[in-house]
Amino acid sequence: MMNAEQVQAAVNQVMPFGKYAGRRLFHLPEPYLVWFKQQGFPAGKLGEQLALMYEIKLNGLEQVVAPLLHND
């Protein structure tokens, strides 16, 4: 179970590589997260954050976590 700080960190984490490098995980398209789910999320913290974003989008919870986005 993740706490609020971990959810906020995941929402604001910047994708470090790939086609969507530089985008916040919150803004990754759902098909990209589905692809990661099928191929396997990377190991470590980033993989956990991507898996969380997959679950958020899968369950339609974007509006719930959107207020956690930083405006920088």
Predicted segments with their positions:
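DEDD superfamily 3′-5′ metal-dependent exonuclease/proofreading module
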Residues: M1-D72
